[in-house]
């Protein structure tokens, strides 16, 4: 019931997030456990999870907000079509340390930002970000408990073809360190003690968020617009970020995560045993095809079906034969009637001709 309540609340607040500025919507939290004691427990993933984004996303697993996510054979396209579009998907499940691997192609365009965000309700955050005016670079960043007093935590790395080709971007997150990988190559490591002695180290249960947003929208702050490469040109839409595969590993096995106090320390998080409703939804087998259903039928049922089909075929053939015979008989009767009428007409003509011959006398006879 707690997980269901949380999903309902997140869905409702997802609509509210659509009304916020793109920056706020990307980092939205609806109940901060550092400020409130009655926040609902976080439903755990509690397992490994892989999904290919070339089919519709399960609405019981993912919350889509603030724009259109278009599905294609190659994956999901997060598209900015108009002002303030910032299509984003956010998992309903939470992971408490683990691995997030995303195969994606970032969007190009001045003022356009593509992002992968691992974020908790206390605003712990681990980021990948691409600025559309920098086609061969990717930025990594982190925040602890919403602390934005300093923006010197980010590091930028070269990545050829980030906006032309799909690449593998992976975060490995443990209580001791965070590692960022590009195409399986380690590019950055952040140790716990390096993040202000651990105070700014992301360490609380987090959702996974993928999205694109107009960092260069005129409504954003000047500093954000400058960081995004300048004002976005909405006349040049669409701007598209594409994702084809996502792998998530939760380091813990459990049903829910709860905060035992307001410290925000990972040691204060309780792991509640069980399996979450979301995990059950993920593990639910897909609908079976007709071929699979047929193979699973017992032999007696198959024989009965074949017999029924055979009976229907025989009945159909009998009906067709009956109709043919009936039609042929009707045709014969009609032909007989027409033939009798023809003979009668011929006899009448011959009789009239005989009478005429008897009455006709040649001139001079």
From Swiss-Prot:
Its EC number is 3.2.1.14, 2.4.-.-. GO terms for cellular component: fungal-type cell wall; membrane. GO terms for molecular function: glycosyltransferase activity; hydrolase activity, hydrolyzing O-glycosyl compounds. Residues 324-365 are cytoplasmic. The keyword Signal applies. Keywords: Allergen, Cell wall biogenesis/degradation, Disulfide bond, Glycoprotein, Glycosidase, Glycosyltransferase, Hydrolase, Membrane, Signal, Transferase, Transmembrane, Transmembrane helix. The chain crosses the membrane at residues 303-323. It catalyses: Random endo-hydrolysis of N-acetyl-beta-D-glucosaminide (1->4)-beta-linkages in chitin and chitodextrins. It holds the Pfam family Glyco_hydro_16. Residues 50-243 form the GH16 domain. It comes from the Eukaryota. It is found in: Membrane. Its main location: membrane. InterPro entries: ConA-like_dom_sf (IPR013320), GH16 (IPR000757), Glycosyl_Hydrlase_16 (IPR050546). Chitin binds at residues 129, 209, 213. Dual chitinase/transglycosylase that plays a role in cell wall architecture. Chitinase and transglycosylase activities are coupled. Required for the polysaccharide cross-linking at the septa and the cell wall. More specifically, transfers chitin to 1,6-beta-glucan in the cell wall. Plays an important role in fungal pathogenesis. Involved in cell wall assembly and regeneration, filamentation, and adherence to host cells. Belongs to the glycosyl hydrolase 16 family. CRH1 subfamily. This is Crh-like protein ARB_03382. It comes from Arthroderma benhamiae (strain ATCC MYA-4681 / CBS 112371) (Trichophyton mentagrophytes).
